[in-house]
Amino acid sequence: MDTYETINLNDYTQIGEGGNGKTYVTSADSDEILKVNNARLSKWEAVKHEYDVSKAVASLGIPVPAIYRIVQVGDAYATISQRIKGKKSLSRICHDEPERTEEMARLLCRKGKELFATECNTQFFPSRRDQALLAIEQTSFVSCKNRERLRSFVESIAEDSHCLHGDFQPGNIIQAGTDNYWIDLDRFGHGDPMFDIGHLFLICHIYAPMKRVQDIFHMTLEQFHRFWDTFAKEYTGQDEHAVFDALAGRFAALDVILRTIFQKPNFVEKLFFGFYVRKLMKQYYS
């Protein structure tokens, strides 16, 4: 393992905090930003993966903030990246200007379609279909019957070599002026776009009633529902999207199962995920 520059947080000022960690700068006009992930994501392997993925995504021509180097903060590892000054996430814009919620949903849809049309580096990035099959095998919070139903569904999904974000939602596009950037890329892969869209559906319809989720995204339950409705209409080109919603619900169940691969859930998380898989299976796999 290489030796990395050691950072003292006393020299930095915190400017942000999200679900995965905190961000810092040395001064108000700094062109670089320090990102320190939460404990589970600050081990060397996780940060090196984040660094390599960011470089690989940028090489595909996808707009992402430049990542410069890995550093150490105490026992944790972190990254120094390009600071996008004046940036706001689409979810923050929805909070600050609620009347623009539909506009932000249409923007996420357009940028999503651009992403889904981009050929991926399938030698570097994983197949989401393969990951889903592996997750079904490894999960301990799904019954044997539901595991077979999920496996049958995944096997019916065609392999796809186009890009997927992995955490496709309005908090993961930031906007600065007329420029938009994708962030939080550690789950990047390739596959059917509905894997990403199922994740968005899960947030907007299944997790949205939770106060913690509303706080993370700075959006109300009503805004989440408006956001999904506009996104679905824009994506399908139709005002009626019940069939699209039902398909998204099926992929949402897979998204929960994929937590087994992405975050190695603890006992309490397994109970949580198991509850929502059963709920989704009952509604969308019956």
PLM regions and their residue ranges:
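ATP-binding pocket architecture of kinase catalytic cores
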Residues: 13-14, 19-123, 158
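Short beta-strand-loop-alpha-helix junction that forms the active-site gateway
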Residues: 38-40, 187, 259-260
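Active-site activation/catalytic loop segments of kinase-like enzymes and analogous catalytic loops
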Residues: 197-237, 252-268
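An alpha-helical support segment within catalytic cores of ATP-dependent transferases
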Residues: 2-5, 117-166, 170-171, 176, ...
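Conserved N-terminal boundary motif of the eukaryotic protein kinase catalytic domain
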Residues: 6-14
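Inter-domain helical "communication" segments and dimerization helices
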Residues: 86, 90-95, 102-104, 110-132, ...
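ATP/Mg2+ or Mg2+-diphosphate-binding catalytic cores
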Residues: 242, 254-286
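Catalytic activation segment of kinase domains across protein kinase-like and atypical kinase folds
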Residues: 173-197
